[in-house]
Amino acid sequence: MTNYKLDMQKRDKVGSNAVRKLRVKELIPGVIYGKDFEPINVTVDEKELRKVHLMAGTSSLIDVKVDGEEHTVIIKDVQKHPFKNHYVHVDFKEIKMGEVANFTIPVVLEGRDEIRLQPSVLMQLLDEVEIECLPKNLPNEAAVSVIDMQYGDTFEVKDLDVFKNPDIKVLNDETEAVCSLSEPKEEVIEEDVEEVSADVPTVSETEEEDAE
């Protein structure tokens, strides 16, 4: 398990005016909170935050320094601008290394591009699982190999690797569906049927025939 690193500074001023001034300096406001822990308002460099967020996601431990004070955290929530690709605010949850905690980790379907049975359609039905463990046992993901799946197969939470790990308690129902494999349905191509217009006389033609 790799701990990522991030430097922060304490933030004394709050409010929209203070936030605008931070944006000019490419700094993002955030907060560190936790159990029996006084929340700390912080600022973090946006480029460094983006880099760590891309690698750590919300399921990896991050060692942070706040004006030299060390904490271990995970990214709990990130707010981004609805139109622009920049961060607006970030929440960090402090993790106590000696205490069991709840985490959310992503589900990964290993070998999804190498499934032997082809053609086939793989449907991922669960993106994340909730687990409980000591921080030192925190995995980056919950994985299952799908290479040998057959038509009609459905993998459940109990098939994930973390479910078999004695150091981890999975909080999801063990029968919750994770993914399924099916045979692609044949597309019914409707041929364009050209309507052959019947040789039906028009009103004027009928009138002409009657006149004759």
From Swiss-Prot:
Residues 181-212 are annotated as: Disordered. GO terms for molecular function: 5S rRNA binding; structural constituent of ribosome. Keywords: Ribonucleoprotein, Ribosomal protein, RNA-binding, rRNA-binding. Residues 188-197 have a biased composition (Acidic residues). One of its GO terms (cellular component) is cytosolic large ribosomal subunit. It comes from the Bacteria. Transmembrane segments: none annotated. Pfam families: Ribosomal_L25p, Ribosomal_TL5_C. The keyword Ribosomal protein applies. Disulfide bonds: none annotated. One of its GO terms (biological process) is translation. Belongs to the bacterial ribosomal protein bL25 family. CTC subfamily. This is one of the proteins that binds to the 5S RNA in the ribosome where it forms part of the central protuberance. Part of the 50S ribosomal subunit; part of the 5S rRNA/L5/L18/L25 subcomplex. Contacts the 5S rRNA. Binds to the 5S rRNA independently of L5 and L18. This is Large ribosomal subunit protein bL25. It comes from Finegoldia magna (strain ATCC 29328 / DSM 20472 / WAL 2508).
